[in-house]
């Protein structure tokens, strides 16, 4: 092979396939350098949208545009006054909506946490409600076409298996069923493993899925970009606070115990250290209640772990689907992270080498659509981490993107 090397197909161990498929087929504004540029992109998108009444754009970030803020409702109104539009933030945890969409949803979102009428920005539960509405406006035929296009795109980047977290607001969780059917329809060897995002174990059991979890309903906190990742110590900027922990320990532990006793594999979203600790406590409690040797439960993201939590993950064999693409991320730069949490905590982010040294199984995922599925980028970020104390070898990074990914869903012997 000369200077080339043959490797197994890569695995993306955490993505939102329905969302990525939709946004991949729509307007992506991640590369815009100003809100003025985003507005122009939206204007052109509207002009080419034909008879569509509801539009979606993705990738807005206040940290990669010269204005240093998100595009506003009023700015969207100027270029899209007659159609509903939702511009989703780069982290997938917030959005900005125009007045036409706000008028449609005001009765549902005005009293929810995260509602900001003046700017049109929706966070937390207000965002979830907007997402539910948009999701149910999608054509099923278009969704299937977009999924196939998204799979083809990922295959072109060497990805042969994805773990998709599903359950983003379709009535009756129909998207979970759609993704399961779509996965079975693939005839080229491509593999899809579906994680239903629910704290109701019956959602998985009734669909004969062996796993449960992800983000949305299984997210224990928010994210750094929206200032709602749950922190043990307060943020250091003027906004302060310690983020948002969506559930108390009792609810999370109860869910984990039920899912574990049902024989399901569990994964939960935890970005901040407070959420990470909660996830560790809950999984530990579940396994103490009903020990299982080969459960392969996991905590997604693990951006700001604690020593105590890492010890639990090591001792209880809890695996970690991480996103090395978050390292030195244009949409969420270190300068911003340091401004909200200080230098010491910023330097503790994404300690992949520490995870490896503790014998924890670490795999890589894109969290698409938050980042584009590209395993070469994952390897590059993990190996060439600017924080060299947490950089890993090429061989370690390659294993994270291949064997470990298959291990996560019990596929390592087959794939």
Residues covered by each model-derived region:
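Extended low-complexity acidic/polar segments
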Residues: 77-82, 239-242, 311-334
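Divalent metal-binding segments
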Residues: 1-188, 194-199, 225-258, 262-275, ...
